[in-house]
Amino acid sequence: MNFTAKDVADLRAKTGCGMMDCKKALTEAEGDVEKATEILREKGLAASVKKASRIAAEGVAYAMVSECGKVGVVIEVNAETDFVAKNAQFIDFVKTCAETVIYENPADVEALLAAKAHGSDMTVDAMLKDKILTIGENIKIRRFVRYEGDCVAYVHGGGRIGVLVRFETENVPAEVLNECGKDVAMQIAALNPAYLDKSTVPAEALDKEKEILMAQIQNDPKESQATSPLSSTLLRKQRRPAAR
């Protein structure tokens, strides 16, 4: 036998196949893990590989802050159906991914997959493949954002929207920051503003909005006499404070 028990375990984590199937495939492949994977696929045994080709269009957004309150993350993980997106095992996996982002600080999704999952000896990728096999649907970690500083997290609609707000503060009590942060986060969840304030709006975006608003006003005879003041008011309404 020119392979080890670890090779069998790695192949099982990669494909979701049983131990005996993995051992047989490695024996046939003379210890080559990639070739063994292909053998399992050809035999129709690599369940997680097959499921990984299916579209993951549903899922959840999850936001959390570290115990010290100085590191926050918002992450999106997708599944195939809304039913699985509400599954306890799926949600636990999403939370584990978020914790791993906080404590391991991966640069991107690829680095997150390679990292050891928080509180586990498995990598995130191995845990992902295990969940695909157990739950029976394709699962994809789509994206995440990690901030360092005074952060407040908010999740709306059971995971339909996740918001993470970072503040620049000095000696603000935690309860005050959390209360204010939740109010701001709820506004962001409701309005989905694109910019923090007027100074952060690109000139081309502002010009485009002016064109749209002017066209709307000109198409409304009632507003034709108050074009300039009204357009300025409408533009101000489009730029509500945000941090997303």
Where are these regions (language model features)?
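N-terminal assembly/interaction segments in proteins that build large macromolecular machines
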Residues: 2-244
